[in-house]
Amino acid sequence: MANYRLSNEAKNDLIRIHQYGVRRFGITQADKYFNSFFECFELISQRPFSFESVSYIKKDYRRCVCGVDSIYFKINGNIIEIMAIVGRQDLNEKL
């Protein structure tokens, strides 16, 4: 099992997603959705190669779908680097 690390961009994405969730759905639902990302991060760290390669979007990236958002990550030895969490935004703008 690898460890995972969040990029600053991914941390900012989580904050943005949580704030949006609180405004749109309330704190309870926003917290549940926020916590689901960490469940996905654990799953990614356990089986990183089970997620699709999206090198056609960005070299060496893989994607895990979590709810309505996609987690983009890279495998760097024993570290999974969570690079960004993208929802309906333009991929070219975010990645």
Give a label for each model feature.
Residues 1-57, 61:
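Basic, Lys/Arg-enriched alpha-helical interface segments
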Residues 66-95:
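Enriched for short, Lys/Arg-rich terminal
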